[in-house]
């Protein structure tokens, strides 16, 4: 076993960790074997030197090895998730997109937690709707199979997360745990859209996904947002057959107007709930509908539907029908 002292010494000297060292470090983290002051120092040291794809992949495996097992789902399973930490406090776009994608017929396992650095995390929102976020893995699987949608609350699956919550709250800034969050879904979706908070993270995240054996994915950075943007360009790394293709898309590629980022501003969970309820019931504002639709359209690309304009139009029509709200109601009733 590699000593924590040796690992910390390397980080404080701005040296990259190898796979074994990073795995060991995050095994220490998730088992509560690192004191709070040292936790914060390690997270800052990693951030300052910038995390490598090797460090991230090893950390993912360490955390997944310490999570509750989720029953295998037959067929394709999707994930739509952002790292968080983009600082804009928008409405919960990826969570809404997950619900809409499920209504469109795609099986989606949404993994996440409560807010760390924003006003409303995905599961703060879901709780405000009355979703039971602590269903057993078997119950969540049944919900997924019935309604195409299952919510996996990170602290329920990884009880060790309680050991790192205080450090993340104290720091109130983006850390490697923002990067790890989208990668440690116990349901292990094989088709994922992951938004990152920095353009510099696109390639490391894409390389990590390949290391983890994900067969189809896109990593997106939306000009400041950790999702596909409707205010400006979105930078994309698409993964297929272990190859990474980089490109850029803009609102015109989705056949939508360009909107201001302030049009997506959110607030506390109760405020966001009312906005998202309107979207799902077909009464949402154009900017809100568009933001959700482009993210689902990008997911559809992973299923062989390459026409982003057509995808977006299809989803906008579904949103306007109001049928998406029933999908959420089904999940609430199930719990």
Curated annotation (Swiss-Prot):
Anthranilate 2 binds at residue 168. It holds the Pfam family Glycos_transf_3. It catalyses: N-(5-phospho-beta-D-ribosyl)anthranilate + diphosphate = 5-phospho-alpha-D-ribose 1-diphosphate + anthranilate. Pathway: Amino-acid biosynthesis; L-tryptophan biosynthesis; L-tryptophan from chorismate: step 2/5. GO terms for cellular component: cytosol. Its EC number is 2.4.2.18. Mg(2+) 1 binds at residues 94, 227. Binds 2 magnesium ions per monomer. NCBIfam families: trpD. HAMAP family: TrpD. Homodimer. Catalyzes the transfer of the phosphoribosyl group of 5-phosphorylribose-1-pyrophosphate (PRPP) to anthranilate to yield N-(5'-phosphoribosyl)-anthranilate (PRA). This is Anthranilate phosphoribosyltransferase.
